[in-house]
Amino acid sequence: MALPEILLPALVDEAAALVNEYYTKLYRNGVPQTGSRFDNWAGGGDRVEVANAITADDLLAVSFLSVPVPAPAIIGLVETRSAEARRLLEEIPTDLDLAAVTADEYETILGALSPASKLWRLLRGTDTYRWGIGPTTASKIMARKRPRLVPIYDSVVGPLMGLNNNDTQWRTWHAALTDGAGLPERLTAIREKSGISLQISDLRTMDVALWMHGKKLGMTVREDADS
């Protein structure tokens, strides 16, 4: 597939500069980019103690990425349906990179009947009732819990990757990372060249580079419609 130019080999240094800006730039009164705290807020969402539970800290961290989680969804995910979320998270590996998922493993890990897809449907309220979580918010919750496996999808990075909707996003991301063109290695290089001390995943590196690139192109962030 054709990648956005910011992910091409010739622009590794430029992408690294964007990642550095995102994580280090201070705005008025010394306030950082709020999204720079998403990854490691309260120690991160994939640390052993909380890896299999959606916590209030996870949902607070998601709000740092400009997507407030509706109150009914918070109650559902943290309280009334927390056991279901935990059961699904227990079946989704914490130590697996999307780039390492083989073609034979894809359906088991991310296919329509996988625990990851079932968690996505739970987050969206697909099989019960809608509680206000759209695809962007769902992707950010999943990326908080499994940062190495699930990428963020939104109205900036999606179009840059040629995604018209969220239905096929995981397969598209997977194809880009496993086509042998060296994207995983470039993402590692981007993170290393960025000079940031925070150890973020390759997927988060890609997300930040794409998002910053899109914003500088003048792309606008649309609301996360619950549809």
Where are these regions (language model features)?
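An N-terminal alpha-helical hairpin/helix-loop-helix interaction module that forms a charged
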Residues: 1-129, 148-227
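Contiguous, well-ordered alpha-helical segments that form the cores/surfaces of helical PPI scaffolds
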Residues: 139-144
